[in-house]
């Protein structure tokens, strides 16, 4: 038994359903294929057109699983009662029968690299989405930038991974409204056009205590800040 989203196939359909911002989902009960993963005969499936994902703009994998799990249990019980598992088996799947393998999208296992922030291409909305779906995100840039933006050659600095435990979208682009005395959080300015501001609610710097990264990065910003940079002391342009 597994969650499906129409053309998704693979080990992580719930995560990819949310990452692709899909609005509908459902459940499939299938047999085990003798050779291939996730290609068994469909014994039961959520009817067309599927189920609306509750609160889809804010839904997490855990919440989606909690929504689907009791429905999946009910489907399994009904399948056992109807003995749909007994030969001759009937494929009752309604979606994808006329689709080629190329059209059926793969939902691969989530890897660590999926949480690696690509500042060149990820927008603020993409970062918030991945944070909600994947949990902690990370990069190797923020630590260096907290120092190198102040005129220091960043190539001479060691790489340090920063693990981000949470973000908030800063709705006001007026840097003057950011607190210069708050030592518990800082902001990152994205590269999209126009740039967006994300407040880091908590982070960990490689080699440091979990959740204590913000203070270390803010210490860098305070130590190396220059009055004529035009950058707010609590902001890093990544």
Locate the predicted segments by residue.
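An anion-binding loop in the catalytic cleft
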Residues: 103-105, 112-238
């Amino acid at each position: 038994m597994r969650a499906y989203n129409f053309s998704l196939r693979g080990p992580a359909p719930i995560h990819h359903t949310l990452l692709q911002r899909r609005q509908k989902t459902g459940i499939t009960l299938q047999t085990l294929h003798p050779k291939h993963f996730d290609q068994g005969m469909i014994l039961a499936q959520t009817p067309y057109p599927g189920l609306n994902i509750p609160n889809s703009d804010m839904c997490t994998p855990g919440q989606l699983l909690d929504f689907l799990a009791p429905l999946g249990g009910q489907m399994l019980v009904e399948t056992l009662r109807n003995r749909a598992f007994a030969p001759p088996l009937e494929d009752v799947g309604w979606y994808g029968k006329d689709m080629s393998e190329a059209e059926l999208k793969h939902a691969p296992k989530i890897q660590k690299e999926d949480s690696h922030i690509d500042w060149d291409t990820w927008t603020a909305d993409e970062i918030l989405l991945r944070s909600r779906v994947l949990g902690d995100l990370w990069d190797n840039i923020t630590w260096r930038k907290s120092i190198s933006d102040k005129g220091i050659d960043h190539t001479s600095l060691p790489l340090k991974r920063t693990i981000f435990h949470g973000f908030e979208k800063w709705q006001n682009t007026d840097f003057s409204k950011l607190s210069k005395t708050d030592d518990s959080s800082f902001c990152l300015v994205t590269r999209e056009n126009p740039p967006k501001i994300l407040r880091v609610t908590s982070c960990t710097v490689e080699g440091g205590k979990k959740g204590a990264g913000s203070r270390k990065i803010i210490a860098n910003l305070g130590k190396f800040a220059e009055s004529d940079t035009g950058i707010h002391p609590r902001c890093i342009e990544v």
